């Protein structure tokens, strides 16, 4: 059982907080979805763009992690046709009528299936979004509920995408951890698991997100501000803007829009990378906003360390003592499930 699966079993969510609003039949913004708190100013910013095919740009990865905690990658090896197919299948999924989608609704103690994002439990107001979580064999089980006789194409596309993300995440984590001084021997756990046991490989899951057209986007929130609990997140955001990050220079006072770049993917550093780098890599606060004219979809792939692997700061020395204690991912996920964006502070030395 993966750390993420165990987390959901140990921290079940009230079923009333799982099923999203039927957005198709909602013409005005209900009070349950009105976020009245004034939001900080949003601007555009020079988010780093790094080509993975250019060795001269690999040195920019660490700088991007330290200064931004988020960056675009191009020439990543994931074909445009696969990204297009993923986009089409997400829209196919989320365009289903509500009575069909709830056939695959996740149970209160389950980590996969259809429903609202888990972080909604930390807010009084609801978010203008819906999601579909995928992990392992759950994909075909839930897809069969949605399309009893026509699920093969959806499953094949998502399985191909998960495999591409597995390969890309291994490559990225190796490069990023290498920039902190780790050797190939240190990163033995990054070798892709060929046995199917999952004991010598990263843990991962895929979150498909839908942000429907909103009647009053200035008062709504697609995805509330948060950091990710992973090592890193690889995000496909299509060609419609919506992702915003907290300004590294003006935290809490300004948001920066991450404009889509055709064919690129966005990498967001997670809390575990912040811990491993002893605070050098930023775990960036980010959110998703909605709009009045376009239905936006995104696919977020979360990568974490193997189950029961202890991690801790790797770059500490006598001049820079460790600021976080060692932990396993399951332990951190449990803290995040209770303390949300304050979880990092619990692991300080």
Swiss-Prot record:
Key word Iron present in the record?
yes
Tell me the pathway.
Answer: Plant hormone biosynthesis; gibberellin biosynthesis
BP-aspect Gene Ontology terms: gibberellin biosynthetic process
Q: Which reaction does it catalyse?
A: gibberellin A20 + 2-oxoglutarate + O2 = gibberellin A1 + succinate + CO2
Class of the enzyme per the UniProt entry, highest EC level: oxidoreductase
* PANTHER family from the UniProt entry: 2-OXOGLUTARATE (2OG) AND FE(II)-DEPENDENT OXYGENASE SUPERFAMILY PROTEIN-RELATED (PTHR47990)
Annotated protein name in UniProt? Gibberellin 3-beta-dioxygenase 3
Organism of derivation? Arabidopsis thaliana
Gene name on record?
GA3OX3
């Amino acid at each position: 059982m993966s750390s993420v699966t165990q987390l959901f079993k140990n921290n079940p969510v009230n079923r009333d907080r799982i099923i999203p609003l039927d957005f198709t039949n909602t013409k005005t913004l209900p009070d349950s979805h009105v976020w009245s708190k004034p939001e900080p100013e949003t601007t555009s910013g020079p988010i780093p763009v790094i080509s993975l095919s250019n060795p001269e740009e690999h040195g920019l990865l660490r700088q991007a992690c330290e200064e931004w905690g988020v960056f675009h990658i191009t020439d990543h090896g994931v074909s445009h046709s696969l990204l297009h197919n993923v986009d089409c299948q997400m829209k196919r999924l989320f365009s289903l009528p509500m009575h069909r989608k709830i056939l695959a609704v996740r149970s209160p103690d389950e980590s996969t299936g259809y429903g609202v994002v888990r972080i909604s439990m930390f807010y009084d107001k609801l978010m203008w979004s819906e999601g579909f979580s995928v992990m392992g064999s759950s994909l075909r089980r839930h897809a069969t509920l949605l399309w009893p006789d026509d699920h093969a194409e959806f499953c094949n596309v998502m399985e191909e995408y998960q495999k591409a993300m597995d390969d890309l995440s291994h490559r990225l984590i190796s490069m990023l951890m290498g920039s902190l001084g780790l050797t190939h021997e240190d990163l033995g756990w990054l070798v892709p698991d060929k046995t199917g046991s999952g004991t010598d490989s990263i843990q991962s899951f895929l979150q498909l997100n839908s942000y429907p057209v909103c009647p009053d986007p200035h008062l709504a929130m697609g995805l509330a501000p948060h950091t990710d609990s992973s090592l890193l997140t690889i995000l496909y955001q299509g060609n419609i803007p919506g992702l915003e990050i907290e300004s590294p220079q003006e935290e809490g006072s300004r948001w920066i829009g991450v404009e889509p770049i055709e064919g690129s993917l966005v990498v967001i550093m997670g809390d575990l990378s912040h811990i491993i780098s002893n605070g050098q890599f930023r775990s960036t606060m980010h959110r998703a906003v909605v709009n009045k004219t376009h239905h936006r979809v995104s696919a977020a792939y979360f990568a974490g360390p193997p189950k029961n692997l202890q991690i801790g700061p790797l770059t500490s020395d006598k001049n820079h003592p460790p600021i976080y204690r060692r932990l396993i991912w399951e332990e951190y996920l449990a803290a995040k499930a209770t303390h949300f964006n304050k979880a990092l502070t619990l692991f300080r030395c």
